[in-house]
Curated annotation (Swiss-Prot):
Protein name listed in UniProt: Superoxide dismutase [Mn]
Reported function: Destroys superoxide anion radicals which are normally produced within the cells and which are toxic to biological systems.
The organism of origin for this protein: Haemophilus ducreyi (strain 35000HP / ATCC 700724)
Top-rank taxon, per record: Bacteria
GO CC annotations, alphabetized: cytoplasm
Keywords assigned by UniProt, alphabetized: Manganese, Metal-binding, Oxidoreductase
Length: 213
């Protein structure tokens, strides 16, 4: 088995004017593809690791030979993070139901949640990700550096939790369209959050059947 670049499930221009076609195409077909290629090359002599769920491998990187561990953390992390990111994007969905209720419960209001998420994304120094996670039954906003993920746990990533959705704040995710205006890119994100997918992940995890991918 080898890792494969996932289909987006929508056209590169489907998220315009918020996320532009050129950025989406380069981001998916070049940047994400590179993470896939590098992960396959790193693990080609370890078929037993390629057979594992990528998320499960990232949760316990001690399974990876020490000399390859950092490279797998970065590249397989990039593959898994981007796969979740693409699934979490769609126009025309609405925050509602159990996820909305939980956001209000844990943050006080939807507006307070959005402000906290925007702050986490804007203040992540350099490259990284902002996340909405479920941790011990409670929603939280966290951020990670580089291609780290909350699924790696606190010892590796500094944070933990089950990802509900994420935002890529690497410059390659927005620079062609937004240049150095990261806050504008972050605010545009709310127009393309796939709340249906976020709700599905939240409800499945609440029911005890969510899979870390």
């Amino acid at each position: 088995m080898t890792y494969q670049l996932p289909e987006l499930g929508y056209a590169y221009d489907a998220l315009e004017p918020y996320f532009d076609k050129e950025t989406m195409e380069i981001h998916h077909s070049k940047h994400h593809q590179a993470y896939v290629n590098n992960s396959n090359a790193l693990l080609e002599k370890h078929p037993e690791l390629l057979e594992k769920c990528p998320g499960a491998l990232l949760k316990d990187l001690t399974q990876v030979p020490a000399e390859k561990r950092t490279a797998v953390r970065n590249n397989l992390g990039g593959h898994v993070n981007h796969t979740l990111f693409w699934k979490g994007l769609k126009t025309g969905t609405t925050l509602q139901g159990a996820l909305k209720d939980a956001i209000i419960r844990d943050f006080g209001s939807v507006e307070a949640f959005q402000a906290e998420f925007e702050q986490a994304a804007a203040t992540r120094f350099g490259s990284g990700w902002a996340w909405l996670v479920l941790e011990e039954g409670k929603l939280a906003v966290v951020s990670t550096a580089n291609q780290d993920s909350p699924i790696m746990g606190k010892d590796v990533a500094g944070v933990s939790g089950y990802p509900i959705f994420t935002l890529d704040v690497w410059e390659h995710a927005y620079y062609l369209h937004y240049q150095n205006r990261r806050p504008d890119y972050i605010k545009a994100f709310w127009n393309v959050v796939n709340w249906d997918e976020a709700s599905r992940r939240f409800e499945e995890k609440q029911a005890g059947c969510g899979c870390t991918k």
